[in-house]
Curated annotation (Swiss-Prot):
The keyword Hydrolase applies. Signal peptide: none annotated. The keyword Hydrolase applies. Its EC number is 3.1.-.-. It is an enzyme of class 3 (hydrolase). This is Metallophosphoesterase domain-containing protein 1. It holds the Pfam family Metallophos. The gene is MPPED1. Keywords: Hydrolase.
Amino acid sequence: MWRSRWDASVLKAEALALLPCGLGMAFSQSHVMAARRHQHSRLIIEVDEYSSNPTQAFTFYNINQGRFQPPHVQMVDPVPHDAPKPPGYTRFVCVSDTHSRTDPIQMPYGDVLIHAGDFTELGLPSEVKKFNEWLGSLPYEYKIVIAGNHELTFDQEFMADLIKQDFYYFPSVSKLKPENYENVQSLLTNCIYLQDSEVTVRGFRIYGSPWQPWFYGWGFNLPRGQALLEKWNLIPEGVDILITHGPPLGFLDWVPKKMQRVGCVELLNTVQRRVQPRLHVFGHIHEGYGVMADGTTTYVNASVCTVNYQPVNPPIVIDLPTPRNS
């Protein structure tokens, strides 16, 4: 759910307040859009009543609101790898879930690389070093990376619990000494690593977060509902590009084998009702590879590996007009 602290009169009042002196009541589209941005910055996202059942949530919102139906939502063809980049645009190359299988990937031309997590199998330092070497071999001007549930050593609370409980479900990770993993992020010297943090490149504000709904007790897992919402509430308004490891509800989150939607309802409401980024990149659900759009945000599930962990899905290319202030 979401609610707002404003009533219908606020849009008119804020648009009027944003008018230059002497223009009276002549509302331009830019003033109305500015007022709408003010409105969205005041939206408060609450835990959805269907939070614990994303498949039911999808059905409810689709039937009652048409929220996932054309023309509101549609599949989108990614930019061909050999297409020329339009003047004044920045080319983003999006990948996710490479799982230490980067050798077969044919990386296309671009300006900024985005990796949405699961670049290793278990987050072992040796895997991170190998991934960092691969990053260093790539020619992109910027390389932005977040962790996923497979980067176990990047989740310090997970590691503390793992060692404390003497739990050997992940034996190779459990045997690591704290000094081997406490600063594992420092091994990523060839990229910008984001974890509930933001960076601005080429004028684009980019925010990254690794969290996702509980998934068999891996890294960066949180219960659906309030715990995840608190993480999404950290995402600031005005972000141009959002990177999360898991998908929002209804966008490239379908798991055919289980006949279930597995995306996060609170992430969907945060993206659509409050943040409204131009681009949202994620992975995690290997079966969901592809691109969708809702008229405001382009959603990219950039999972390179299939459900059988074969690295056959090509990187997804997205061109965005470069902000004028870059």
